[in-house]
């Protein structure tokens, strides 16, 4: 039957106040190490009735049983009290009791009592509280008059033989059976503050049920199976796992598992998952994990002792003493047979039935009026004494007090003849009804019920009995529960409060409180000095004089504990020791132990010095035969190695496949990039292949006639001027109307507003003036002026002005509408004619100038535009070059008329031509400025006077005839590949021709340049005439050809040495200096000079003209010291020429021509080479021409005469020329023919006379001393008119070659820079 009393809360034992009854308490439990024999007096005087029941509340609690050591049976007193009460409830009248002997307290219970006894129930004699009818208050309880009956004890020598132990169906619930919980797992008893005690116990039980035996961690799969039942999202569980797995080991220890469960519960309650754990929680979990790790390491170091079947009986109880033999240990917790219990009850109640007859029966065992007893354990009912009545040999012998339930250090041996109390059994319920006085008491069902895991609905099961086989009563369970109950820890609420107090006083945030501050805080509690010193000694664990946060919290906990009346412990329990101190002490112990273990003596021979001992002929048994375990381990290791190898191989394959994929991707990207680049190049080629707009008709729309386009452009250009005139007329009209309005309305106030409006300030000032005038008139006696309607007049005046302004605004709006309408019409017409509108400006600027595009696209657009300009210029100059080749005379005439036809902006008829002209001029100016800065060479423009030299009538026929002969000779003698550069050379446009009369469109800078150039020309002409006069005098006085050597400030390879005897290496040395970069600028300018007679060319090799080449010995001395010195100065850059003077070059031309006339051919070496074809002879040129030209404008010298019988060497290819500053016509790009020489001698190398180059450096005569005025050519010329001729050693180009004009070339746009033509092959 289910016991209704087992669910009642335990009532405080109120019957412990023995002072009122002069009764001594029963000494029970473990608490007494020695028991004193105290004489009992309380049982001689008994109180009757219920007169002392009101004082029951003052009775103190009796320490009974083992209730202070076990937690597994907390409710057993309540369960046992009602069970045994009905048995003692049968009270008999004590009317016939004759002996009233004082009962003496009996010492029951022995050291051999096992913990498996009745807890808190002293099974001793039962004092009865009776009342007498006569009013007397005496007690006759347990004073039997008959013989004592044998008591049921635990001796083997029972009078009645004991039955063997049998399984008894007692109704106990097997709650402690093994349900899969791993109780062997050792988890330190550390309290986690962030979860409650109940949650920690639940999590620990769940952890033990899941953990694998032999391990202290749960795997990720096991944890996942638990956490997924919460219903959270996978990403939330993943984040919880990341926070919980503090060691990143992939497994969870118990504190980490508890943390994970705490986070899951927090999320389920609506909280969010923290991004990172707070420091407090992290520290607690970390310290718990460290404690587990240290405990595991300590347990592994402790040597395991062999286990015995009796270990579980003594686990956790250190006070167990060896038991005396001869006694049967009480194994049954209240499982005696009911028959024996009934017999014992009958035997115990026999003396009570022989009591006094006059005693009135008292109801005992009830709840309503429980009599006062001196041995009461509860406030509910009297406790029966099952075996506490010691049988005596004589009736009058007092009973001795018995100690029950304790293990005493001194064994109290009872008097001889006494039977020791061994049965602390729980009595079975009486199945019979109570006799008297307890009719209202019902029989209670017995059965021990564990209070912790009781399930009321579970079926009753039979319990195992016997010695040491019932795991329900194992001491391990009892001890672990007892320890858990005794553990005292600081609650999280206390910790948080104490930590806040600590942080409040720790103003410096050092983590420590000094002794003065901490003691002052503790002193506020009001405790005495001794308690405070005790608390300080307990909390200052490391004896540092300061307290950290954990030590301060411990001290505050001890302070509050002492204030609550508890006793301070002498030493801290493990649960109160701060975790930091525990970890520090553990580390210290491990270090100490590690030092002792590391001091092992090394073996005599280690593995490195091992040598096989061949004396051992017989192998050891271990090597001959392997055990099964070793083979399994080897196989497992092999399997692990194979698995690792497989994993490595798989990873390698994955890496190889990944690398292959990356390579394929890179190759694919490269191929795609290559395809994109090819497509881009194709687009570029397609764009470049598009026809240029300049090659088309001047108009984008061929259907529109040219005259209509010109008319439209003219009208469009007149529109802005017309609107400007309209605006001016409108302004004049408004001003006239305002003036007329002022004349009509004669108002005395002059307005200061717009259009002379009268403002309020004007009226105010006028009113003040009128007031002053009126005052003056009053003083002088004059009549005051009448200005009453001043405001009305001002308003009328302003209205007239406003009317004029409104009319003007209407007119302006009408004009604006007309302008907008005209612009719309002109835009549509312009779109039809030119293919674009002004609104396309931004887009055109973007794609024409590359604005807002990528750098690559912008560079391509710029390069394409440059190439398009080059193609356009080539296209425009094609017709002009053809015209030059047709007729030289017509070309000259056209060239003569060109400045007159193309000299101004207005001479162009179409807008395209005018825009091309403007662009051409702008490009020329830009190139000139860039050339002045040294950024880029000029492509064809120079900065001398734009006026071409005017030739006399006598020079024109001769020059024309010479040009025709040179062209014919060039066409006959030159190979085809030499004729290729002739067209671009002849097609060089005369870009400077329109510059003579472009004053209308040039700015002030161009005007200043032209003025400077004119002054420069005048100075040069003056100097040139003076020097020519001096040179003519020198030529007349010169006696030898060597004296006419030209010292022009440059290299002397133009100079003609005197005839010398040829040597064998002259023909080879002739081409020695042709690739010298320092001489190309002058070597390319050699042209035939004109003389008085037919000149004879010298066959001296060119090696003689090289200053670095040793001069061949000659018959007459041809070395000129001054010329050599001047040459060296030129090479070193020390000459005085600044490259501006034009007369120097002219002088050089004249002197070279005279020198070429005077030089005669000398002997040549006999080793001649193959002859070359002979060119036709050229006509002789009279000397008067040279004389006139030397004084007048310089011209190109005539070619020398050659003999008909001499063989000619093929002339070098013509070099491209360009227009220089002093030339008005393009130069002739042909070289003069070489003179014929005899077939028996080596052909002489022709020495070409220098071409006419205006602006070259001045030349001096051979023996002429440099004068001071020679260095005065350096003029202060701005950089914008600087020339490139200062670069004396640059690679010669087309702009460095200049000849006299031979014909007129029609003007054309400037050509791009012509590439440098390679020099001719060496002479044979």
From Swiss-Prot:
The gene is PAN1. Disulfide bonds: none annotated. Pfam families: EH. Component of the PAN1 actin cytoskeleton-regulatory complex. CDD domains: EH (cd00052). PROSITE patterns: EF_HAND_1, EF_HAND_2, EH. Residues 622-690, 999-1036 form a coiled coil. This is Actin cytoskeleton-regulatory complex protein PAN1. Residues 55-67, 371-411, 1061-1074, 1082-1103 have a biased composition (Polar residues). It is a peripheral membrane protein. Residues 593-614, 911-923, 1009-1031, 1122-1135 have a biased composition (Basic and acidic residues). Residues 1-98, 299-427, 593-634, 891-923, 935-1175, 1201-1240, 1259-1324 are annotated as: Disordered. GO terms for biological process: endocytosis; endosomal transport. GO terms for cellular component: actin cortical patch; endosome membrane; plasma membrane. Signal peptide: none annotated. Residues 199-288, 494-583 form the EH domain. The lineage of its organism: Eukaryota, Fungi, Dikarya, Ascomycota, Saccharomycotina. It comes from Kluyveromyces lactis (strain ATCC 8585 / CBS 2359 / DSM 70799 / NBRC 1267 / NRRL Y-1140 / WM37) (Yeast). Residues 998-1008, 1136-1146 have a biased composition (Acidic residues).
């Amino acid at each position: 039957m289910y016991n209704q009393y087992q669910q009642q809360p335990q009532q405080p034992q109120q019957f412990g106040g023995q002072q009122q009854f002069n009764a001594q308490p029963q000494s029970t439990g473990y608490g007494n190490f020695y028991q004193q024999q105290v004489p009992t007096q309380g049982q001689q005087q008994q109180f009757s009735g219920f007169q002392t029941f009101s004082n029951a509340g003052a009775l103190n609690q009796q320490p009974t049983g083992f209730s202070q050591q076990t937690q597994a049976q907390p409710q057993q007193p309540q369960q046992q009290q009602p069970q045994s009460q009905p048995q003692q409830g049968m009270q008999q009248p004590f009317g016939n009791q004759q002996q009233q002997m004082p009962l003496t307290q009996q010492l029951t219970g022995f050291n051999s009592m096992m913990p498996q006894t009745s807890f808190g129930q002293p099974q001793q004699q039962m004092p009865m509280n009776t009342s007498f009818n006569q009013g007397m208050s005496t007690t006759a309880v347990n004073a039997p008059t008959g013989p004592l009956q044998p008591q049921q004890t635990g001796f083997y020598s029972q009078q009645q033989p004991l039955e063997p132990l049998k399984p008894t169906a007692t109704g106990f619930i097997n709650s402690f059976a093994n349900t899969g919980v791993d109780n062997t797992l050792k988890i330190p008893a550390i309290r986690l503050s962030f979860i409650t005690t109940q949650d920690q116990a639940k999590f620990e039980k769940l952890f033990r049920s899941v953990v694998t035996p032999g391990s202290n961690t749960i795997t990720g799969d096991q944890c996942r199976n638990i956490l997924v039942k919460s219903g959270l999202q996978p990403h939330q569980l993943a984040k919880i796992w990341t926070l919980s797995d503090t060691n990143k080991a992939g497994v969870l220890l118990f504190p980490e598992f508890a943390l994970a469960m705490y986070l899951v519960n927090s999320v389920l309650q609506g909280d969010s998952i923290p991004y990172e754990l707070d420091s407090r929680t992290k520290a607690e979990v970390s310290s718990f994990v460290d404690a587990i790790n240290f405990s595991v390491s300590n347990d592994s170091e402790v040597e395991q002792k062999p286990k015995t079947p009796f270990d579980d009986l003594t686990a956790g109880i250190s006070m167990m003493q060896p038991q005396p033999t001869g006694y049967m240990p009480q194994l049954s917790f209240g499982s005696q047979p009911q028959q024996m219990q009934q017999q014992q009850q009958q035997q115990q109640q026999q003396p009570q039935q022989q009591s006094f007859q006059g005693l009135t029966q008292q109801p005992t065992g009830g709840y309503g009026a429980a009599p006062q007893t001196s041995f009461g354990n509860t406030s509910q009912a009297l406790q029966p004494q099952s075996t506490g009545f010691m049988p005596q040999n004589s009736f009058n012998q007092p009973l001795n007090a018995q100690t029950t339930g304790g293990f005493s250090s001194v064994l109290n041996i009872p008097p001889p003849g006494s039977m020791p109390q061994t049965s602390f059994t729980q009595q079975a319920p009486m199945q019979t009804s109570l006799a008297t006085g307890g009719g209202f008491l019902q029989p209670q069902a017995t059965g021990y019920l564990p209070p912790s895991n009781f399930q009321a609905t579970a079926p009753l099961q039979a319990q195992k009995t016997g010695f040491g086989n019932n795991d329900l009563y194992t001491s391990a369970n009892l001890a672990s529960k007892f320890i858990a109950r005794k553990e005292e820890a600081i609650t999280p609420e206390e910790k948080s409060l104490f930590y806040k107090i600590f942080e409040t006083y720790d103003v410096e945030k050092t983590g420590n409180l000094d002794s003065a501050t901490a003691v002052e805080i503790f002193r506020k509690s009001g405790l005495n000095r001794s308690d405070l010193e005790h608390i300080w000694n307990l909390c200052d664990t490391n004896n540092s004089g300061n307290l950290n946060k954990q030590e301060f919290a411990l001290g505050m906990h001890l302070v509050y504990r002492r204030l609550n009346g508890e006793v301070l412990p002498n030493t801290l329990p493990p649960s109160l020791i701060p975790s930091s101190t525990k970890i520090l002490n553990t580390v210290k112990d491990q270090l100490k132990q590690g030092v002792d273990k590391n001091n092992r003596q090394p073996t005599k021979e280690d593995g490195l010095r091992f040598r096989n001992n061949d004396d051992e002929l017989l192998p050891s048994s271990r090597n001959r035969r392997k055990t099964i375990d070793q083979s399994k381990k080897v196989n497992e290791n092999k399997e692990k190695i194979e698995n690792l190898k497989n994993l490595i191989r798989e990873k390698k394959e994955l890496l190889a496949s990944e690398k292959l994929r990356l390579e394929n991707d890179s190759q694919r990207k490269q191929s795609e990039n290559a395809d994109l680049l090819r497509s881009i190049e194709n687009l570029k080629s397609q764009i470049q292949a598009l026809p240029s707009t300049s090659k088309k008709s001047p108009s984008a729309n061929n259907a529109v006639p040219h005259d209509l386009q010109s008319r439209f452009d003219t009208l469009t250009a007149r529109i802005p001027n017309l609107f400007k005139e309209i605006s001016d007329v409108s302004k004049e009209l408004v001003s006239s109307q305002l003036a007329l309005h002022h004349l009509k309305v004669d108002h005395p106030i002059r307005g200061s507003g717009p259009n002379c409006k009268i403002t309020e300030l004007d009226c105010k000032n006028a009113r003040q003036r009128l007031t002053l005038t009126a005052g003056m008139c009053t003083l002088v006696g004059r009549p005051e002026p009448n200005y009453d309607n001043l405001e009305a007049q001002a308003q009328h005046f302003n209205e007239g002005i406003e009317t004029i302004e409104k009319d003007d605004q209407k007119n302006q709006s009408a004009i604006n509408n007309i302008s907008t309408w005209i612009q719309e019409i002109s835009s549509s017409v312009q779109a039809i004619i030119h293919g674009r509108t002004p609104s396309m400006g931004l887009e055109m600027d973007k794609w024409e100038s590359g604005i807002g595009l990528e750098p690559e696209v912008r560079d391509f657009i710029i390069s394409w535009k440059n190439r398009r300009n080059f193609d356009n210029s080539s296209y425009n100059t094609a017709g002009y070059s053809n015209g030059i080749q047709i007729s030289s005379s017509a070309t000259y005439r056209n060239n003569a008329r060109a400045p007159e036809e193309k000299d101004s902006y207005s001479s162009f008829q179409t807008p395209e031509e005018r825009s091309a002209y403007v662009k051409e001029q702008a490009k020329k100016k830009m190139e000139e400025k860039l050339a002045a800065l040294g950024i880029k060479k000029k492509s064809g423009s120079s900065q001398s006077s734009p006026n071409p030299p005017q030739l006399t009538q006598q020079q024109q026929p001769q020059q024309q005839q010479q040009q025709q002969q040179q062209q014919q000779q060039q066409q006959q003698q030159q190979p085809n590949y030499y004729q290729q550069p002739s067209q671009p050379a002849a097609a060089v446009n005369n870009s400077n021709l329109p510059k003579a009369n472009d004053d209308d469109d040039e700015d002030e800078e161009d005007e200043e340049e032209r003025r400077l150039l004119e002054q420069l020309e005048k100075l040069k002409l003056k100097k040139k005439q003076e020097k020519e006069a001096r040179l003519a005098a020198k030529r007349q006085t010169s006696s030898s050809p060597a004296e006419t050597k030209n010292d022009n400030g440059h290299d002397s390879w133009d100079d003609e040495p005197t005839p010398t005897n040829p040597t064998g290496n002259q023909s080879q040395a002739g081409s020695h200096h042709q690739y010298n970069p320092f001489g190309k600028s002058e070597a390319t300018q050699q042209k035939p000079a004109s003389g008085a007679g037919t000149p004879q060319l010298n066959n001296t090799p060119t090696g003689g003209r090289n200053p670095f080449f040793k001069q061949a010995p000659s018959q007459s001395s041809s070395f000129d010291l001054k010329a050599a010195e001047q040459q060296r100065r030129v090479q070193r850059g020390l000459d005085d020429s600044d490259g501006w003077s034009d007369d120097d070059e002219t002088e050089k031309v004249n002197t070279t021509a005279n020198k070429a006339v005077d030089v005669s051919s000398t002997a040549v070496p006999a080793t001649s080479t193959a002859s070359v074809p002979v060119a036709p002879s050229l006509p002789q040129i009279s000397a008067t021409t040279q004389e006139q030209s030397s004084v007048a404008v310089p011209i190109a010298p005539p070619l020398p005469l050659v003999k008909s019988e001499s063989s000619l060497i093929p002339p070098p290819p013509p070099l491209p020329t360009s227009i220089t500053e002093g030339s008005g016509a393009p130069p002739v790009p042909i070289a003069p023919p070489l003179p014929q020489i005899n077939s028996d001698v080596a052909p002489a190398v022709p020495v070409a006379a220098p071409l006419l180059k205006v602006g070259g450096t001045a030349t001096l005569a051979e023996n002429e001393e440099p004068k001071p005025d020679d260095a005065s050519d350096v003029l202060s010329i701005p950089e914008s008119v600087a020339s490139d001729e200062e670069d004396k050693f640059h690679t010669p180009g087309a702009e460095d070659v200049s000849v006299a004009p031979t014909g007129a070339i029609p003007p054309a746009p400037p050509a791009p820079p012509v590439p440098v033509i390679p020099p001719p092959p060496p002479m044979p």
